[in-house]
Amino acid sequence: MYTFVYKVYFFLRRMGKHRAFSLQHEPKWYRCLLNYCEWFFNVLVTKWYDLWPNQRMSITKVKRKQRIIVSLTTYPKRIGTVWFTIETLMRQSVKADEIVLWLADSQFPGGLLTLPERLRQQQKRGLTIRFCDDLRSHKKYYYALQEYSNDLVILADDDLFYPRDTIKKLLRMHRAWPEDICCITAQVIEPTFLSKPSLWRNPQINECGLQHTDRIQAFTGSGTLIPPNALPREAFDKRAISCLCPYADDLWISFMAHRNGTKISTLKRWRPFPVSIYGTAKDSLYYINGEAGQNDVQWKNLLEYYGVMSDDGAKSAKGADKHKESVAENM
């Protein structure tokens, strides 16, 4: 049932994207239908998981040479619903070797005993809960990429219902482009790296040229696989993260990947973002970064601090040293 409802949802989203492209807008009836579908999906899945909890181990028993690590983070306002997201990650058609939830010590001073019962039950089925410094959304990659440096790390958000084939599709892309960062959804960076993120666009259905490229920005939350050595050491500079790009891990990872010469690949056929858990969008970083324009500010910070990139992605340090000195004073 879960997979069937997702197929219907994807069909509606693709139909809407075709219509929006031809009509330049979404009809009201379509938006109402889509909202109803998302509402029905939320009711169906939450009731299903409540009434029929899964008691089986939800990580693989197969010994892999290179493990699959799913990493995500959350904060107090979503600690009561993140178990839904984790459940969808546990019920993937391809199982992970480990699912790690990173929590900030400062936000959960009571430790494991103060966490919801659902999360503690998931620990018995393979969930790992780790406590760390508070780096906001950057927690989901910062520690995992360093601790599991030889494994494949898959990033996830804390407010989504993931389709059962998410890990499967990421691994399929990884086999085609083993050194690339592979993501389910992305944004096209155009016309140049100097343009504001608010001007970038979403891919069209079946758009070509979005694999093994430096022309896209990964939406890490939709599901993103990062192979070993994809990011440079400077990607783990806490002070730079907090000063330059505190709210946008997507921008930080994509910028650092391009800076490191790592290409990014997304699906050949456009797939919409996963369905959100109702009640979580209010505090979403989407509104801070997108609606409030913080993406533009943070991208400008990165370009000025590290040096701009030319149209082909090549790095230039022109004007960067002076800006580094001024920014460093505030770090």
Task: Please report, for each region that a protein language model flagged, where it lies by residue.
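C-terminal catalytic/acceptor-binding lobe
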Residues: 2-48, 233, 239-331
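Short loop->beta transition adjacent to catalytic acidic/histidine clusters or analogous donor-positioning motifs
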Residues: 66-68, 90-101, 125-127, 151
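Active-site beta-to-alpha loop of glycosyltransferases that engages the nucleotide-sugar donor
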Residues: 72-84, 94
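Short, acidic, metal-binding catalytic loop of nucleotide-sugar glycosyltransferases
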Residues: 85-97, 106, 121
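Short internal beta-strands
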Residues: 100-104, 183
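Active-site-proximal specificity loops/subdomain of glycosyltransferases
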Residues: 104-151
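Conserved catalytic core of nucleotide-sugar-dependent glycosyltransferases
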Residues: 144, 161-239
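Short beta-strand-to-loop acidic/aromatic patch adjacent to the donor-nucleotide binding site
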Residues: 151-161
